[in-house]
Amino acid sequence: MKNNKSPGTSGFGADFYKVFWNNLGTFVVRALNEAFLTNNLSCTQTQGLITCIPKGDKPRMFLKNWRPITLLNTIYKIGTGCIANRIKSLLPKLIHNDQTGFLKGRYIGENTRLVYDILHYTEHNDIEGMILLIDFEKAFDSVSWSFINKTLKAFNFAPSTAKWFNVFYKDSKSAVAQCGFLSEFFRISRGCRQGDPLSCYIFILCAEILSIKIWQNYQI
């Protein structure tokens, strides 16, 4: 975990835990193991603060042009980070080369090159076709938890992986922090929290299911 990052509601960032890990490490590990056994984290550990960051120079009067980032407590991120480190080593074998995001050794420019190659091939061989560009709106926030559990099962992840996901996301709450004001906390019922080390890997696994369905449909 990187230093000098904005902390969650606890106010303690990764720097604090790194300095005092010899004193706190045992308690952190014990707390996470207890959470797994009881299938429950304390309400404060799952709290997040949502702050919105503008997307480039796009008009800021539209909500869609803001990117919500959730500031999470460090203990929570230590737990999800451990699971993320275990999952990401498997992803290159599970995720098709068409997906180039979030995976080490893959470059998004390869997809741009692929589009040019397809255009050249169709023109050279006089093949009619169409390119459809689809963008997920609020992609991370729209994934249902039941679908995430089904996805983990479809890729034959151990039941403990799904249990960990449910431990971290069940009963999670967030509040919006903007312009010096803080909203009331509200319950989160879907999506992967941007700011969670695990979220990007969960998302590309879910997106891979869509890719598989497209590959299996020979009419596309």
Task: Write out the residue ranges for each language-model feature.
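Nucleotidyl polymerases of mobile genetic elements and RNA viruses
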Residues: 1-3, 10-220
